[in-house]
Amino acid sequence: MTKFTTEEVRSKFITYFKANNHTHVPTSSLIPHNDPSLMFVNSGMVQFKNVFTGQEKRPYNKAVTSQKSLRAGGKHNDLENVGYTARHHTFFEMLGNFSFGDYFKEQAIYYAWNLLTKEFELPKDKLYATIYHTDDEAASYWKKIAGFGDDRIIKIKTNDNFWSMGDTGPCGPCSEIFYDHGEQIYGGLPGTKDEDGDRFIEIWNMVFMQYEQIDKDTSIELSQKSIDTGMGLERMTAVLQHVNNNYNIDLFQEIINFTENIVKVKVEGEAKFSYRVIADHLRASSFLIADGVIPSNEGRGYVLRRIMRRSMRHAHMLGAKEPLMYKLLPKLVDLMGNVYPELKRAERFISSILEQEEIRFKATLERGLKLLTEETEMLTKGNELSGEVAFKLYDTYGFPLDLTEDILKTRDISVDHKGFEEQMLMQKERARKSWLGSGESKTDQLWFDIKEQHGSTEFLGYTLNEAKCKIIALIKNNNLVNDIKEIDTQFLLISNQTPFYGESGGQIGDIGTIFAKDSEVEVIDTLKYLGSIIVHKCILKKGQINVGENANFSIDIRYRQNLRIHHSATHILHAVLHEVLGKHVTQKGSLVAPTYLRFDISHSKAVTNEEITLIEDKVNEIIRDNHEVNTTFMATEDAVKQGAMALFGEKYDSEVRVVKMGETSLELCAGTHVRRTGDIGCFKITSESAIAAGVRRIEAVCGEFVIKLMREKDSLLKSIESSLKTNKNELITKVNNILERNKEVEKELEKTHLASLDLSIEQIEKQAAQITGIKLLYKKVGNIDNKILRQAAENLTKKVEDLIMVYIAEGIGKLSITVAVSKAITDKYNADIIAKKLSLFLGGSGGGGQASLAQAGGNDIGKLTNIHKKLYSLLTVS
């Protein structure tokens, strides 16, 4: 049996099916574009889901893919098992061949058997097949094609061998192919008590979609039967490299050996598990970041953070003192960058995110581990860590719950999940949003039906501002209607063609007017559904509008021109950011509005004022050069080869529109643009800020809006000059003088306030109340700065060794509490506790401080009348 590399296995699989007239479909992003209920793509069929359900048509009926997939949870792939078992992974590649109404069971089994035994040269006596127990048809094909006897065809009664999308929809029996690693390895055939052993390993699963589930008890035969298969690349490579553990294949071993050379710890004992975790999680983290996911505390970003922090903890276990993961990235890019060029394109950004996250986590990792050690010292095997401690590790030290569980796993200590969740609910500001699906299946089906009946909307707006179009559908309150009669009714309108641009690619939709006979419709927005249906959001202004009639569609030309200007400027900005900030910059989001543009980029630090000036200068230089803007349609592959920028994770058709601006910018884009860069006029950045870790937001204006901005600033400047009775040449000096004078006045005011609050020892003795052997002095004051109240209270408690000083300052709708306690009595009376209790009494949420000095707030001014009583009760029980 020939030994194949991972790359050769992938290549041979794809080449084999291409030779058998399958279309090679590139992998989709890990972020599913067609299933809002799914967090990540976890199998090869996800990108074809709408094809299988009949909601989408493709120009091919047979396909082959090598699909990036990710599983980071669930009963079959718990994160805690990754690295410790032979075949659990977060990121993996799923090889698959698919038929959409073309071939079925016999041909699928033939393709699989022929590839395994002839192309991959697997011994026939090492292979077994499982079938669903009632699928006699599949059994007959296995006997005919492979020559299997009944002893090699295993009938399975459970749903492991019957697949469905849900309670309704396409479904069908499965047939799995198992490989026998040999009797020297423990394990039994599928369906036996020893089936969980490692001897017999599933290497290929074929789903025969032949039924449609109508309801719980009813299924019918499909008129168009389909095939969905999946072969895990890592599993298959392990078989072909004669190893029984996926982590021993060439791809993982290269990463593990590279890591070993850096950390200088041998790959043996417990360390080998850490090396495997790091190798697996490096792939998952890097591909997620390349597809646009940023570590955060919710949704996909939180899954990424969990994976990253688990790998970082294992790097810590190997003794890595400095960030490690980003140092391993070049090796991964070297191994997989040719097959997945998004890794190469995003390498600098991935490296930056990996390093930053590790630096951020290292700051708290050791302290969190120390707390965990202290809290579990008295726990023994079978005990449970409290949910409160687990939550503190999560909230304060950044330990995801499954990381805490992973650490305690070796000691057989569990975590109180219920207690953890209770703590999570109590701290709402730390709660993460749950991942929710759209819940709009009825509405989704409406749009699929429209697309099925009428097809895509033809967009005319690249060359026309107005056109005669046929109205093919009207929608009101999510229902199709034949006409709209009520004036000022809001509704959706679909036509066979339109000059209106539907919001997509960051560019918002057009507005304008539709005229039909005696009717007039105002278009207040234009949207795009299912990628190709252009939907006009309308208000009826006059007459009646009907399905089937022709109408004149006219866009607001000035509105469109301003959109063109800002969209073209966005392309130029993108190119200049690459030049000024670096090639790692990728687009994370954008908004093209008629009055401004917003552009989100991957960049790990703030853009400096100097860089902003340089960016503005370069963009304006390109505008002044008045480059011609050309658009062409070409194959996606050709466009990318020519250097056209594409968005990671974005789904493109086989043919794309490429927008070229001189030699400056080349991007895939379906938006509307100016004819020459000079049409933009001018460009000005208005703000730059952070919106997430590693993501910066730039906002800018162009053309007439730059002039408007300059006029507003000029008007503001003149108002300031008038108010300060100066001119712009003397303005800075005048402002600095005012600021200096203000500082002096503030200092004088501070001295005055402190003097007014100061008391002699005799005055304290006279004014203070005697309570349980100590003195209590309470004063209500006006809206005085907290800093002054702190200083005044501290000064008084230094003069008298048994004093509790309480100030309550009343501001506009709020109260400020200051409590100071003489240090000689802090063993009995704690300023922090007193301040917090007063705060809660006065409607606040508690404050903070030390035993001798603390401050807090409140807002229930009405309760001040009872403050004396509250103070007395607090001190008599202290």
Swiss-Prot record:
Keywords: Aminoacyl-tRNA synthetase, ATP-binding, Cytoplasm, Ligase, Metal-binding, Nucleotide-binding, Protein biosynthesis, RNA-binding, tRNA-binding, Zinc
Keyword tRNA-binding: yes
Localization per record: Cytoplasm
Signal peptide: none
Note accompanying the cofactor annotation: Binds 1 zinc ion per subunit.
Any one of the GO BP annotations: negative regulation of DNA-templated transcription
Residues the entry annotates as binding Zn(2+): 567, 571, 669, 673
InterPro entries xref list: aa-tRNA-synth_II/BPL/LPL, Ala-tRNA-lgiase_IIc, Ala-tRNA-ligase_IIc_anticod-bd, Ala-tRNA-synth_IIc_core, Ala-tRNA-synth_IIc_N, Ala-tRNA_ligase, Ala_tRNA_ligase_euk/bac, DHHA1_dom
EC number: 6.1.1.7
Database matches in PROSITE patterns: AA_TRNA_LIGASE_II_ALA
Pfam families recorded: DHHA1 (PF02272), tRNA-synt_2c (PF01411), tRNA_SAD (PF07973)
Cofactor annotation: Zn(2+)
GO cellular component: cytosol
Reaction equation(s) it catalyzes: tRNA(Ala) + L-alanine + ATP = L-alanyl-tRNA(Ala) + AMP + diphosphate
Classification via CDD domains: AlaRS_core
Gene Ontology MF terms in the entry: alanine-tRNA ligase activity; aminoacyl-tRNA deacylase activity; ATP binding; tRNA binding; zinc ion binding
Cited function: Catalyzes the attachment of alanine to tRNA(Ala) in a two-step reaction: alanine is first activated by ATP to form Ala-AMP and then transferred to the acceptor end of tRNA(Ala). Also edits incorrectly charged Ser-tRNA(Ala) and Gly-tRNA(Ala) via its editing domain.
Alphabetical list of HAMAP family matching this protein: Ala_tRNA_synth_B
Family statement: Belongs to the class-II aminoacyl-tRNA synthetase family.
Free-text note on domains in this protein's UniProt record: Consists of three domains; the N-terminal catalytic domain, the editing domain and the C-terminal C-Ala domain. The editing domain removes incorrectly charged amino acids, while the C-Ala domain, along with tRNA(Ala), serves as a bridge to cooperatively bring together the editing and aminoacylation centers thus stimulating deacylation of misacylated tRNAs.
Protein name as it appears in the record: Alanine--tRNA ligase
Source organism (scientific name): Rickettsia massiliae (strain Mtu5)
Gene: alaS
